[in-house]
Curated annotation (Swiss-Prot):
Record function comment: Assembles around the rod to form the L-ring and probably protects the motor/basal body from shearing forces during rotation.
Signal peptide: 1-29
MF-aspect GO terms: structural molecule activity
A single cellular component GO annotation: bacterial-type flagellum basal body, distal rod, P ring
Keyword Signal: yes
Record region (Disordered): 296-316
Protein name as it appears in the record: Flagellar P-ring protein
One of the Pfam families matching this protein, by short name: FlgI
Transmembrane segments: none
PANTHER family: FLAGELLAR P-RING PERIPLASMIC PROTEIN FLGI, FLAGELLAR P-RING PROTEIN
UniProt keyword list: Bacterial flagellum, Periplasm, Signal
Length: 374
């Protein structure tokens, strides 16, 4: 069994408490439709732009090594009436950056949004920098927002003549409310005759239950599941021109989602997450630990006095093999998640050993769930 330090024990203890909290919850919890599905077409749009950050304390791009930074600086100064063509520029306070952000759905002109600023050249840090006016473009090439402002950096970098230290990523930062929306995306929701609900986790049963909940609420068959991820809603006549009011009511309806039995395994951290619908057929599980220890203790061989011999090192290797914890447990047919965990814990199995056991049970065809390894 793999050894766990104090930090690992604490982490597993916290995971166990969380698992108990979930197991103590109702077996058939309901969720709002708002938490299960999105309105198709109501989404964010990604924006991107290229700009310059100035005001860096000598940690910017090396202009001789990064030609696009030098060209951008020259072009910007020329637009402001400063001609530096042919002049030597030696500043280290400028960095070329990419600016990204998400345009919120239904954002109107003047709405502010956050942006992320990332260095493109060899700048060591963007600490203390200010982003100059940067147009942000959508996938269609149109400008939807303009960004500018002082950066907030999550890391730092410092160096001396013989040593340096870096924490976090000092070449990446954010500007809260650093962009202003200049163009709106037209989306006439209130004039739509049909609306589609896009499920976040597609499932036939959940889609059918959502449609049934909407139809029961409206008293007419206006909702119909199209596929596992889509429910189409025909807007009733009394809500034409006021679709927002209808969707406000529908979002609050309670539905019991159905999920696929799945086990998620993160081999790097040893974390295992199992859904409540995981079932196991009859299977016997044996678990034991084989430990091989090898120790080297070289010996010195001294020659007799007044002899012509030489002092030499002779190797000595001790190999030991120990096996402990051999146990066999029978997991009965159709056991629940809690019974499975209790049974495996009875063998003294840790999280990392449990990963291999679950994969072996799946290979034997005795586990009724999908296993996804991250």
């Amino acid at each position: 069994m793999s050894g766990l330090g104090f930090t690992g024990v604490v982490r597993i203890a916290v995971m166990a408490l969380l698992a108990l909290a979930f197991l103590g919850a109702p077996a058939h919890a309901t969720s709002r439709i708002k938490d299960l599905a999105n309105i198709e077409g109501v989404r964010q749009n990604q924006l991107i732009g290229y700009g310059l950050v100035v005001g860096l304390n000598g940690t910017g791009d090396t202009l001789n090594n990064i030609p696009f930074t030098k060209q951008s600086l020259q072009a910007m100064l020329e637009r402001m009436g400063v001609n530096i063509r042919g002049a030597t520029i030696r500043t280290g306070n400028v960095a070329a950056v990419m600016v990204t952000g998400n345009l919120p759905a239904f954002a109107t002109q003047g709405t502010r949004m956050d942006v992320t600023v990332s260095a493109m050249g060899d700048a060591r840090s963007l600490q203390g920098g200010t982003l100059l006016v940067t147009p942000l473009l959508g996938a269609d090439g149109n400008v939807y927002a303009v960004a500018q402002g002082s950066l907030a950096i999550g890391g730092f970098s410092a160096e001396g003549a013989a040593a340096s230290v870096t924490k976090g990523v000092p070449t990446n930062g954010r500007i809260a409310n650093g962009a202003i929306v200049e163009r709106e995306i037209e989306f006439a929701l209130n004039r739509m005759p049909n609306v589609r609900l896009a499920l976040r986790n597609g499932d036939f049963t959940t889609a059918k239950r959502i449609a049934a909940a909407v139809n029961d609420f409206l008293g007419t068959k206006t909702a119909e599941p199209i596929d596992p991820s889509t429910v189409q809603l025909s807007i009733p006549a009394e809500f034409r021109g006021n679709v927002v009011a209808l969707l406000t009511e529908i979002e609050q309806l309670q539905v019991e989602p159905d999920i696929t039995a799945k086990i998620i395994i993160d081999e790097r951290s040893g974390i295992i997450v199992m859904g409540r619908d995981v079932r196991v057929a009859t299977v016997a599980v044996a678990q034991g630990n084989l430990t091989v220890s090898i120790s080297e203790s070289p010996q010195v061989s001294q020659p007799n006095p007044l002899s012509n011999g030489r002092t030499v090192m002779t190797p000595r290797t001790d190999v030991g093999v120990t096996e402990n914890g051999n146990k066999l447990a029978l997991v009965k047919n159709g056991v629940s998640l809690q019974e499975l965990v209790d049974g495996l814990n009875g063998l003294g199995i840790g999280p990392r050993d449990l990963i291999g056991i679950l994969q072996a049970i799946k290979a034997a065809g005795a586990i009724e769930a999908d296993i996804e390894v991250m």
